[in-house]
Amino acid sequence: MSVKHHVYLVPGFFGFTNLGELLYFGHAYEFLKQDLARRGIDAEVVTVVSHPTASIRQRTADLLKAVSETASGDDGPIHLVGHSTGGLDARLFVSPGAQVSEALELEPFARRVRTVVTVSAPHAGTPLATFFLGLFGQQLLKLLSLFTMYVLRFGRLPLSVVFRFGHLMARADDQLGWKATLLDQLFDQLLGDFSSERRDAVTKFLWDVGRDTSLIPQLTPEGIDLFNGGTHDRPGVRYGSVVTQARPPSLRTRLAAGLDPYAQLTHTIYAFVYGQTQRMPLTQLPLHTPAQTAALVQAYGAMPGPTACDGIVPTRSQVYGRVLAAVRADHLDAIGHFDQPAHQPPHVDWLISGSGFRRPQFEAMWKTIGDFLMEEEPPR
């Protein structure tokens, strides 16, 4: 009798998996499920619903709830794949002695975990979180969340919205003349295009983002230091990471975006978040093992510098355990949100980075993840 594997996809802080057709892991879920089936593996792949910006402990409790609801019927092995902050949730889940929920016991499930894979996760934090701590940053975080959901639902943001937002980003560093009413107007314009039912769901999601932002200070380089001090690897669990590095914004990347005004303006948004993320303090960069360093050098031709990032998380902050893949991609490319509308179902992108990441690289990356998950499974 074959052993049933339980694979959990854990979202980051854009974790809108509960909004109907707006699927955070849509393409990754379908590909991984089909890939495991092709291998003859009996596996259930589950996308986890978590509070988007709640604390890592609360998000890990959400993960525990999902696992208890779907993996209690047997004692099969459990595998955790976390994108962005979801990678930190996965690490806390298996940390010996972790206490995340008064209602559910963690240890019976944690001891069944065989692998933890983190994708573009901020193991050493990200300076972008420091920016999001401010009032302007908090409003911007909600708007970026809405942008992501809008693009996945409708394909593109209205050009008028992108133009106004791009103008705002050009002045964001000094914030002179910034008025909350402009962001409110952008919210209202975008929400008006959703159906009444979907608008209510999106509004609730955004309200949750604004109500509980406990996660944000935990993701700063200083905040993550405390997390790492209290979170430990579990013996017997295999840890692997997928690392992403995007091209820094430049004249070349602007030219690569072409003449499309939409691509040019959304590239402005990418340039802004990249500029915030690349401010990683040298003292906060983690030391890597020789094997990790060799993997990065082999993939990128040289060791990524301290400013290298995927637009959201510094590249060297993403390394944890075995480096399974190091790819040239932005933060959302890694989960299938890149520009390839001809594919069915289409891949849709709003963070135009000019990374060049497309379906072949996406499939190769997720196949590597599948290889790692089933590394100790006997061939069929």
Positions of predicted regions on the chain:
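Lipid deacylating catalytic domains
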Residues: M1-R380
